[in-house]
Swiss-Prot record:
Residues 66-84 have a biased composition (Basic and acidic residues). InterPro entries: Znf_CCHC. The modification Phosphoserine is found at residues 52, 96-97. PANTHER family: PROTEIN SREK1IP1 (PTHR31437:SF1), SREK1IP1 FAMILY MEMBER (PTHR31437). Residues 85-94, 106-141 have a biased composition (Basic residues). It comes from the Eukaryota. Interacts with SREK1/SFRS12. This is Protein SREK1IP1. The gene is Srek1ip1.
Length: 153
């Protein structure tokens, strides 16, 4: 019926990594992760005290290398962001100077166009006024007493 050694009372929950009861797997301190990105794990419980000094040195070297890599990556990211900012500033400066030159040219062109239009209007007005004045003179000549005397004779 029931197997004699499989009672709940006899089975203790223990660590799956090291097998010791009293702590769970996520609480295990007998294993160290060398690289958090990779699954490299060192078993501390199985090492002797003589080997621990050597392994500690190796661990320290590995951790130092990791820190260097992380620092280098962060520095690269910072440099890239700085370069982007510099490029944006350069673009803005060059863009603004180009627009100032363009806008100055455009303003000159607009001013010249306005002047030409004014000149054309003045010429056309002069012509119109001149024609009106001619008509008035003709009417005056016809209605003038001297003109009427000449026509009667």
């Amino acid at each position: 019926m029931a197997v004699p050694g499989c009672n709940k009372d006899n089975v203790r929950a223990g660590c799956r990594k090291c097998g010791y009861p009293g702590h769970l797997t996520f609480e295990c301190r007998n294993f160290l992760r060398v690289d958090p990105k990779r699954d490299i794990v060192l078993d501390v419980s199985s090492t002797s005290s003589e080997d621990s000094d050597e392994e500690n040195e190796e661990l320290n070297k590995l951790q130092a290398l990791q820190e260097k890599r992380i620092n280098e990556e962060e520095e690269k990211k910072k440099e890239k962001s700085r370069e982007k900012i510099k490029l944006k500033k350069r673009r803005k400066r060059s863009y603004s100077s180009a627009t100032e030159e363009d806008s100055a040219k455009q303003k000159k062109q607009k001013y010249q166009k306005k002047e030409k239009k004014k000149e054309k209007k003045n010429k056309s007005k002069k012509g119109k006024h001149h024609k009106k004045e001619k008509k008035k003179r003709k009417k005056e000549k016809r209605s003038s007493p001297y003109h009427s005397e000449l026509t009667k004779k």
